[in-house]
Amino acid sequence: MHSSALLCCLVLLTGVRASPGQGTQSENSCTRFPGNLPHMLRDLRDAFSRVKTFFQMKDQLDNILLKESLLEDFKGYLGCQALSEMIQFYLEEVMPQAENHDPDIKEHVNSLGENLKTLRLRLRRCHRFLPCENKSKAVEQVKNAFSKLQEKGVYKAMSEFDIFINYIEAYMTMKIQN
């Protein structure tokens, strides 16, 4: 009887000891996040460089999809929501279509999407970087313009992915400094 009670106590104590360690690990990953951000942005840029030429050659339109108003939203009070919506837009609307345009680039677009998913996951874990729910008008404008461009919208959105990375960087730099 005593040995089973002792075993229960050990299991309970092990569980109690493990819990604070998990919280510390999460906190540590958030404190290290600003230092890891340049690496994550570099990974995004490297992945994009593998498809950039393909999409920019196919993009025959003179207009800009990712306008300055989007960057202003990223820098303003809607920054969190604008970033969240744009990541979702690229992952759910742009990249699935982009993967289907050429079998040679499908793997590279998929890799780019995985890097973007990793960034989104890390942002969500560190709530100070993505604590939002409001809608961004600039993101709605991007989505509407994308829809109007129909098939050409994929080329436009993918050819401007580097601008999106720059906007992510501007938002994150601002959040880290605050």
From Swiss-Prot:
Identify the SUPFAM superfamilies for this entry: 4-helical cytokines
Q: What does this protein do?
A: Major immune regulatory cytokine that acts on many cells of the immune system where it has profound anti-inflammatory functions, limiting excessive tissue disruption caused by inflammation. Mechanistically, IL10 binds to its heterotetrameric receptor comprising IL10RA and IL10RB leading to JAK1 and STAT2-mediated phosphorylation of STAT3. In turn, STAT3 translocates to the nucleus where it drives expression of anti-inflammatory mediators.
Q: GO molecular function terms here?
A: cytokine activity; protein dimerization activity
Q: Do you know which Gene3D superfamilies this protein is assigned to? A: 1.20.1250.10
Query: Where is the protein situated, by its record's location annotation?
Result: Secreted
Q: Which UniProt keywords apply?
A: Cytokine, Disulfide bond, Glycoprotein, Secreted, Signal
Q: Provide the glycosylation site positions.
A: N134
Enumerate the Gene Ontology biological process terms: branching involved in labyrinthine layer morphogenesis; cellular response to hepatocyte growth factor stimulus; cellular response to lipopolysaccharide; chronic inflammatory response to antigenic stimulus; defense response to bacterium; defense response to protozoan; immune response; interleukin-10-mediated signaling pathway
Q: Which residues form the signal peptide?
A: 1-18
Q: Which PANTHER family match?
A: INTERLEUKIN-10 (PTHR48482:SF5), INTERLEUKIN-19-RELATED (PTHR48482)
Question: In which family does this protein belong, per the annotation?
Answer: Belongs to the IL-10 family.
InterPro entries to which the protein is assigned, alphabetical = 4_helix_cytokine-like_core, IL-10, IL-10/19/20/24/26, IL-10_CS
Quote the protein name from its UniProt record: Interleukin-10
